[in-house]
């Protein structure tokens, strides 16, 4: 009797879904140029999914983009009438019971919530899904695809289980379960994209998943910032962050001055200050795969070199981003007592971030990759702005950073400090290594995202 009741209950739950799925299959035939894009994360901090949506819209698809709306996406996305952003509510874990139980309950409720949101959306010919996070979104999107006739496209940025392993250890039961889940449901997708050749090979060899490498490429708005816009940005940021403010007042009170630039009151001409500090930029999601103590130790060594009389500029170090370890590192930064270095950790508006990269003198990347198979998108954006980079070494970094060509690769804080000393010696030196790297980046004529997407992704969605 109990078994019969359970079967009846299951049928009662599944029948409406099957009927709704059948109707959505019929609807999908009438909306073949519609795509649903899903990221179980913050849309504003998921640039690659924003770029997918913009590229799809540019080529005639309408797009429904589902994700958390914690940060403002780029204006191009918000102003595109082919793209609809549907906000998801971030579910909080229960505060009772063992942590594993709390996590399990959260995953189940997230699955039901995402299923409900997807089933009441316009059906898409494709469901584009960012992974990670893939638990429970891969299974839910696959199930919805089965019901509605949509083809699941997984864009592999990394492995979710490897990120969990940084916190719990690689042999934790949750991590092993997540790995099995990711591998099992990942094989059920129709198309797979990934960010490096190393990941493509790993997916093929270990998970029997065939993927197409779609390298991260900078969007068109990542470019060198004109001096006038640099000045406006510095004046704006100076309102809330003291490192951007002028070190001294100009003789003419009508002259606008920042820490780096000034605008002549009469002519309106913007010039760089003769003894301006160097602007060093890093961006981060403040997670376990980025060790900012390396940068702080290198800055301490740089400070000592300056105090010892080496010909080095003052530094303004801007670390932008949001994430769980931000408060921890902010506390470490406040404990430092630099005389020639100022550090600030702003969260920038989407439109200001490319302007900052295009105004900086050097980028630093501390991303090491939990799997060793993904590449830091921040470096891609920096290269789009022709900004040279010092990046910490890991397994497949060579696919992006060419040592001594477009930047430098380091292993530890000692090596980073030596690189900072070499690059900023006699700053600003037109004949220095920093300007040579920038020249190489200008001459490389790298593909932009739209050009790369047309070559790699568009043929897949048009042919299938």
Swiss-Prot record:
Residues recorded as bearing Phosphoserine in the entry: 242
UniProt-listed Enzyme Commission number(s): 2.4.1.142
Intramembrane segments: 100-120
InterPro entries in UniProt: ALG1-like (IPR026051), Glyco_trans_1 (IPR001296)
Membrane topology summary: Single-pass membrane protein
Keyword Iron assigned: no
CDD domains: GT33_ALG1-like
Role noted for this protein: Mannosyltransferase that operates in the biosynthetic pathway of dolichol-linked oligosaccharides, the glycan precursors employed in protein asparagine (N)-glycosylation. The assembly of dolichol-linked oligosaccharides begins on the cytosolic side of the endoplasmic reticulum membrane and finishes in its lumen. The sequential addition of sugars to dolichol pyrophosphate produces dolichol-linked oligosaccharides containing fourteen sugars, including two GlcNAcs, nine mannoses and three glucoses.
The protein's name: Chitobiosyldiphosphodolichol beta-mannosyltransferase
